[in-house]
Amino acid sequence: MFRRSVSFVRSHVLRSFSSQPVVPVTPIVKNPASQGAGTIKLEQSTVELLERLSLVDFSNAEAVSRLEEAVKFASVIMNVDTTGVRPMVTPLEDTVLRLRDDVAEKCSSEDVLKNAAVIEEDYFVAPPGNIPLEPKANYGLGNS
């Protein structure tokens, strides 16, 4: 009888707490004036710099508007008041994880190079990721 009542109370408590989300879906800003509401317009030089650094093509207006929305979202996060909020921790922070021993398997270079799409002088050839993109006309910003 006692065990049944304890399990009922436990399930009732868990059910009542699980219906409310612990982490809010959107950032909570205590000072709405500092939220930075409004639209953010990026200059063409900024878009060119971000395109060159990230190697992402912002060639149309939709891509630039997505970038502006991301910057706006990040500016809202920067204005969130975190005073008095303790940093999050993980239960695995101080735990030594026991991993299995690595067993090295010997295989020939011919077997390994069978996985490569392009081979040059017995080396894998990967597509270059650091070639700068050519600048576009105005990136859909409307201003020149």
Curated annotation (Swiss-Prot):
<dbReference type="GO" id="GO:0030956">
    <property type="term" value="C:glutamyl-tRNA(Gln) amidotransferase complex"/>
</dbReference>
<comment type="subunit">
    <text>Subunit of the heterotrimeric GatCAB amidotransferase (AdT) complex, composed of A, B and C subunits.</text>
</comment>
<keyword id="KW-0496">Mitochondrion</keyword>
<dbReference type="GO" id="GO:0050567">
    <property type="term" value="F:glutaminyl-tRNA synthase (glutamine-hydrolyzing) activity"/>
</dbReference>
<keyword id="KW-0648">Protein biosynthesis</keyword>
<dbReference type="InterPro" id="IPR036113">
    <property type="entry name" value="Asp/Glu-ADT_sf_sub_c"/>
</dbReference>
<protein>
    <recommendedName>
        <fullName>Glutamyl-tRNA(Gln) amidotransferase subunit C, mitochondrial</fullName>
        <ecNumber>6.3.5.-</ecNumber>
    </recommendedName>
</protein>
<dbReference type="GO" id="GO:0070681">
    <property type="term" value="P:glutaminyl-tRNAGln biosynthesis via transamidation"/>
</dbReference>
<keyword id="KW-0547">Nucleotide-binding</keyword>
<keyword id="KW-0067">ATP-binding</keyword>
<dbReference type="InterPro" id="IPR003837">
    <property type="entry name" value="GatC"/>
</dbReference>
<dbReference type="Pfam" id="PF02686">
    <property type="entry name" value="GatC"/>
</dbReference>
<dbReference type="GO" id="GO:0005524">
    <property type="term" value="F:ATP binding"/>
</dbReference>
<keyword id="KW-0436">Ligase</keyword>
<dbReference type="GO" id="GO:0006450">
    <property type="term" value="P:regulation of translational fidelity"/>
</dbReference>
<comment type="function">
    <text>Allows the formation of correctly charged Gln-tRNA(Gln) through the transamidation of misacylated Glu-tRNA(Gln) in the mitochondria. The reaction takes place in the presence of glutamine and ATP through an activated gamma-phospho-Glu-tRNA(Gln).</text>
</comment>
<dbReference type="GO" id="GO:0032543">
    <property type="term" value="P:mitochondrial translation"/>
</dbReference>
<keyword id="KW-0809">Transit peptide</keyword>
<comment type="similarity">
    <text>Belongs to the GatC family.</text>
</comment>
<feature type="transit peptide" description="Mitochondrion">
    <location>
        <begin position="1"/>
        <end position="17"/>
    </location>
</feature>
<dbReference type="GO" id="GO:0005739">
    <property type="term" value="C:mitochondrion"/>
</dbReference>
